[in-house]
Design a protein with these regions (language model features):
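N-terminal metal-binding scaffold of metallo-dependent hydrolase/deaminase domains
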Residues: 1-40, 365
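Divalent metal-dependent hydrolysis catalytic cores, especially in the metallo-beta-lactamase
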Residues: 63-68, 81-110, 123-136, 163-175, ...
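Active-site gating loops and adjacent loop-to-helix segments of metal-dependent hydrolytic enzymes
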Residues: 64, 85-96, 136-164, 208-218, ...
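Active-site mouth loops of central-metabolism enzymes
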Residues: 65-77, 144-149, 191-195
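Conserved, mostly hydrophobic/aromatic
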Residues: 130, 185, 215, 313, ...
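Active-site core of metal-dependent hydrolases
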Residues: 157-279
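His/Asp/Glu-enriched, well-ordered alpha-helical/loop segment
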Residues: 235-244, 262-349, 353-356
Length: 366
């Protein structure tokens, strides 16, 4: 097998611009160069995808489980293999398994499951997204209220230390967590996201001043923008730095609301699927209703894949195709400080590339 391959398609989106009549030359697992198709050396094996689009592969920073295995209910490596398979079915080669508000022992079990998955050679899983329990019960959504509380600094340290190098994101409500707790988490290299929060505009901005760089699922489970109290939503929209995830499935937010947020936030807005799976045991029991999930009648998760999110953004939200692709690749990579090696088709970057058709259906992951 040759060491290098040239991949050709009708269009290439590099993460920065669109190219036609070009090829991506890959050597081992890195992008060697992007060149005009006519200049590909004859001794390099060519793989052509007529009618296809080459684009940076996607990354999903919030997904709870797949194929009947919710991680919080089945905290084991098999759940992560299924979750990763689901992500790849929509073009996401990296994902952040997520556990909602729960007992400490469940968080520990999920941390252990990820370590076991990695030890077995499992790929794609970046770490754990801990969503709660340090949130505001007023904005609990489908979270279990009995576990929700304001943490002591010692509790924060204990969980973070147990999850060292595994916990990568923590969603919390800034108004229920101390400055010391927030700064400690950030100091351990974990991304803190404001979510499930009833913060006032002032409280939200105070949290941002402590270093909180983003918010979780914009619009959902957060204090809304009102003309006399702009809330967390208003603080995010008003910021020029704070990023936010959004779920473009048409259920978590109307497509017009997604479009408005995009017009205001531009490159600060990125996609998550927030995908769950059906389960009838444990604290979180999700029932699929159409193309969404509910728990006791409350919207509790999506049935999105990342490529479906791209389709929705382009079709319903008036987002340009390249920008929709960036929202699923480059921008989440930036959140995780991965954008020096992921999110672009560029010399030296990892060869994590999706092949899509003109409707953004997944053909292949390279």
């Amino acid at each position: 097998m040759p060491d290098s391959f040239a991949f050709l398609a009708d269009k290439i989106f590099t993460g920065e611009s669109w190219l036609t009549q070009h090829a991506v030359i890959i050597e081992e697992d890195k992008i060697k160069e992007v060149v005009p198709a006519a200049s590909v050396p004859d001794d390099i094996e060519k793989k052509n995808y007529p009618g296809g689009i080459l684009a940076p592969a996607f990354i999903d920073l919030q997904i709870y489980g797949a194929y009947g295995k919710l991680l919080a209910v089945y905290p084991e490596a098999d759940s992560l293999y299924k979750l990763n398979d689901y992500c790849r079915s929509g073009g996401a080669v990296y994902c952040m398994p997520t556990v909602a508000t729960n007992a400490t022992e469940v968080f520990h079990q999920c941390i252990d499951a990820i370590r076991d998955y990695w030890n077995k050679g499992g790929e794609g899983v970046l770490g754990l997204h801990v969503e709660g329990p340090w949130i505001n019960a007023v904005k609990k959504g489908a979270h279990i209220e009995s576990f929700i509380h304001s943490p002591s600094l010692q509790e924060v340290k204990d969980l973070v230390n147990y999850g060292k190098e595994v916990i990568k994101i923590i969603t919390l409500a800034p108004e229920v967590c101390s400055k010391e707790a927030i700064e400690y988490i950030i100091g351990q290299g974990i991304v803190v996201s404001a979510g499930h929060s009833n913060a006032t505009y002032k409280q939200a901005n105070t949290g941002f001043s402590y270093g909180i760089p983003m918010a979780t699922h914009l619009y959902n489970a957060m204090s809304p923008l009102q003309h006399r109290e702009p809330g967390l939503l208003g603080a995010v929209l008003d910021s020029d730095k704070v990023k936010a995830s959004i779920i473009p499935d048409g259920h978590h937010a109307d497509f017009a609301a997604v479009r408005i947020a995009k017009q205001v936030m531009k490159e600060r807005l990125f996609v998550i699927t927030d995908a769950v799976t059906e389960t009838n045991s444990g604290y979180y029991q999700h029932l699929k209703v159409g193309d969404k999930y509910e728990s006791m009648g409350i919207l509790s998760g999506s049935a999105l894949t990342m490529n479906k999110a791209v389709q929705n953004l382009v079709k319903y939200c008036n987002v340009e195709a390249g920008e929709a692709l960036r929202m699923c690749s480059l921008y989440p990579a930036q959140v995780m400080n991965m954008d020096k090696s992921f999110g672009r088709i560029k010399t030296g970057y990892k060869a994590d590339i999706v092949v899509l058709n003109e409707n953004f259906d997944l053909i292949k992951i390279i």
